[in-house]
Amino acid sequence: MSFYAPDKDAEFINDIFYTQNQAKLGDTGQSMIEYNNDLYAIIAGSRYLVRMNTAGVEKQRYAIPESEGDPRYLAADDGYIYMTQYGGQVTKLDANTLKVVGTFKGGANLEGIAECDGKLYVANSYTKNDAGYQYHTDLFVINAANMQLETTLTVDLNPNQVLEEDGKIFLISWGNYADKGYSAQMIEPQNGNKQTSLGVATNMAVGDDMVYFVNSETDYSNWPETSTNNTFFSYNIKTATVNSSSFLKNAPAELATSSVYMMSVDDEKGDIYIGVTFYSNSNGTMYRFDRNGNFVEKFDCGGQNPKTMVFID
């Protein structure tokens, strides 16, 4: 876990968790959120959820029982943390103690999660069995208070990334890697869960009443050599308009052909961050643009495969 100061009032720290705790974070940082001035991170390979202060000092951790599936993604609201898991489980934890206070069981391998108006929107992505992979079209709507399923929405195949902005849910589905490709949808909870297709995208970020998309098409057929072509576009929530033109200006040329692993938006400044991976060849690179898409800088992100970026005061 790296620390970066956009205002340049502090040095970049490659491994702030080790600096603060004199211990390694563990195997495979999967996802991280900021909530009530604390950081919560899933360390998937080491099978635990950790709570830290915004300086990276560990406060608590919750070890995932061996009988349960791998942890995946997080959402938070009203004093609780919600964690999706493979094997069909959403775990509800007290944000201050990391004590389990409720669970939802259903589905198979659960991925992205977002909270909106007391409901949890959870992607039920796929099942793996002896016959191979079975991809699903389920987006569960769960009552966050009692952790009961309210309804199941039928969405595009293999739903994965789920985000909320301005009372709307945005979803990226991964298809079946054959005749069904990646897709982006908007779901409107206040309009009967109406669904709108927004295009083809592999990743997205939300903020400032905008949704920023990328379709990062990477050819792995000559692995470990890869080739990538990126298409950037955006959706303005206020005007309900898709802009098929790139939201980036004067971007470094290499970004057009680098595999995008994550995007994030500074919720105060509106700056857009795009992280690319070079897999095991080297550390990833982070590209920073202002809210108008003007290129600001790029920097080594401090490790391979940048996955999540959160912003603190």
What are these regions (language model features)?
Residues 2-313:
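Predominantly soluble domains enriched in secretory-pathway, periplasmic, or organellar proteins
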